[in-house]
Curated annotation (Swiss-Prot):
Residues 1-19 form the signal peptide. The keyword Repeat applies. A motif (Integrin interaction) lies at residues 382-384. This is Nephronectin. It comes from Mus musculus. One of its GO terms (molecular function) is calcium ion binding.
């Protein structure tokens, strides 16, 4: 009986515990999505949110960008996207097998198939031979629209030409379709356009964006002002102003000579200490004594005329004092009278001169008359002045210099002097086109203004060349030279531009060469040695080369670059 009562008590306790279960171990119901049983209670599972009674929706954090949430933090991406949150573009063109037969171009969230010329794109992405497209002979392929063949252009900046086959460029700058930001100008390109900073501005990243910033040409040394001028930076450019004492446009400043005009009339200078009088209002200046000697210094030879004007004879009285006392001389007829003081006689070197009339001594004062006029013919040319000996100073004729001055010294005295310059706007300036060359240098019009030289197109197969020669003549003894020129070698298979020098007989190896690039460039080459007879530009082209070789602004200066 006691055992039975214990069993009943234990079973009642078990039932009470089961009734108080809080649902900590939920069990998902198989027949429902996102529903779980928490003991005797049914609710949404973890990672699901209740939308309506009996329906639960999964929760994804972060949300799916290009897809839908199918489970807790589980996204199903739309076609063309990938990634955990479907935020990445899927490159279908890189999949295997490739989705396109000929050409594939990936786009955001999708892709496009293109066919080669002569083929037509089918709806399934494959390409099929289209006789109509081949007959259309489109420049960039074709498309069939409503049973009609239509040529296509690959860029929105291109449009079909009137012939319906080729594509021509749309000048967005001229039509006004686009507007560039401040301080930029629109530059049209084939199929598009660019906004380029104006001249004097540079594109810089400022304040989180790209802006055209003014270039300080003065501080960067990118100006053409003369060395005797000041450079002032202005917005988008600069200006030059000659310094005090110089005049010009700022690019070329010439020294203004200072002319000092003296009063008319000769200047009388006494041999010893005295005063110098200029005209009626002269200023008295004392001539200092020469050292400790009592005798006047020997006057050096000078070109002005020296006039000896004797004074009256002073009488000498027989007194114990050996020094005679001369009488003051009468005033000369000149408007200004120099004061002269006769020297007392000494035992070592008396200043009196005996005369044939009487044994009395007399003193003679020499008055120096200086002419302040400029002498037309110098007595002797200076040794550091270079004098052309020819009647005409032609550039390529004989140019002699003063004897005793070598070419090296001439370069040191005047380095960087321009001896030749040519921009080919008015001819070849002494350059010679070799007639035996296969090709020839021809002048071409520069869109920016002026002319430049270019190599003609090759018409025969094989290597062809055009040579342009400048003979230096006697300038080859000028020492080192600096050759400066602008050039361009642009386009597909443009050819080669080279520089040679001829010293003895034929020219040697090329000093410089270029076979490609983009746009105009500036180059300087130092021609070493004093035996360079000629400078040669050689442009090579082959048949079928569509590029261009250009040459402009050639100059030669003394000294190294």
């Amino acid at each position: 009986m006691a055992v039975l009562l214990a069993a009943v008590l234990a079973s009642s306790l078990y039932l009470q515990v089961a009734a108080d279960f809080d649902g900590r171990w939920p069990r998902q119901i198989v027949s429902s999505i996102g529903l779980c049983r928490y003991g005797g209670r049914i609710d949404c599972c973890w990672g699901w949110a209740r939308q309506s009674w009996g329906q639960c929706q999964p929760v994804c954090q972060p949300q799916c960008k290009h897809g839908e949430c199918v489970g807790p933090n589980k996204c199903k991406c739309h076609p063309g996207f990938a990634g955990k949150t479907c935020n990445q573009d899927l490159n279908e063109c890189g999949l295997k097998p490739r989705p396109c037969k000929h050409r594939c171009m990936n786009t955001f969230g999708s892709y496009k198939c293109y066919c080669l010329n002569g083929y037509m794109l089918l709806p399934d992405g494959s390409c099929s031979s289209a006789l109509s497209c081949s007959m259309a002979n489109c420049q960039y392929g074709c498309d069939v629209v409503k049973g009609q063949v239509r040529c296509q252009c690959p860029s929105p900046g291109l449009q079909l030409a009137p012939d319906g086959r080729t594509c021509v460029d749309i000048d967005e700058c001229a039509t006004g379709r686009v507007s560039c930001p401040r301080f930029r100008q629109c530059v049209n390109t084939f199929g598009s356009y660019i906004c380029k900073c104006h001249t004097g501005f540079d594109l810089m990243y400022i304040g989180g964006k790209y802006q055209c910033h003014d270039i300080d040409e003065c501080s960067l040394g990118q100006h053409q002002c003369s060395s005797y001028a000041r450079c002032y930076n202005i917005h988008g450019s600069y200006k030059c102003q000659c310094r005090d004492g110089y005049e010009g446009d700022g690019l070329n400043c010439v020294y203004i000579p200072k002319v000092m005009i003296e009063p008319s009339g000769p200047i009388h200078m006494p041999e010893r200490n005295g005063t110098i009088s200029k005209g009626d209002g002269g200023h008295a200046n004392r001539i200092p004594d020469a050292g400790s000697t009592r005798w006047p210094l020997k006057t050096p030879y000078i070109p002005p005329v020296i006039t000896n004007r004797p004074t009256s004879k002073p009488t000498t009285r027989p007194t114990p004092n050996p020094t005679p006392q001369p009488t003051p001389p009468p005033p000369p007829p000149l408007p200004t009278e120099p004061r002269t003081t006769p020297l007392p006689p000494t035992p070592e070197r008396p200043s009196t001169r005996p005369t044939t009339i009487a044994p009395a001594t007399s003193t003679t004062t020499r008055v120096i008359t200086v002419d302040n006029r400029i002498q037309t013919d110098p007595q002797k040319p200076r040794g550091d002045v270079f004098i052309p000996r020819q009647p005409t100073n032609d550039l390529f004729e004989i140019f002699e210099i003063e004897r005793g001055v070598s070419a090296d010294e001439e370069v040191k005295d005047d380095p960087g002097i321009l001896i030749h310059s040519c921009n080919f706007d008015h001819g070849l300036c002494g350059w010679i086109r070799e007639k035996d060359s296969d090709l020839h240098w021809e002048t071409a019009r520069d869109p920016a203004g002026g002319q430049y030289l270019t190599v003609s197109a090759a018409k025969a197969p094989g290597g062809k060349a055009a040579r342009l020669v400048l003979r230096l003549g006697h300038l080859m003894h000028s020492g080192d030279l600096c050759l400066s020129f602008r050039h361009k070698v642009t386009g597909l298979h443009s050819g080669t531009l080279q520089v040679f020098v001829r010293k003895h007989g034929t020219h040697g190896a090329a000093l410089w060469g270029r076979n490609g690039g983009h746009g105009w460039r500036q180059t300087q080459i130092t021609l070493r040695g004093a035996d360079v007879k000629s400078v040669i530009f050689k442009g090579e082209k082959r048949r079928g080369h569509t590029g261009e070789i250009g040459l402009d602004d050639v100059s030669l200066k003394r000294g190294r670059c």
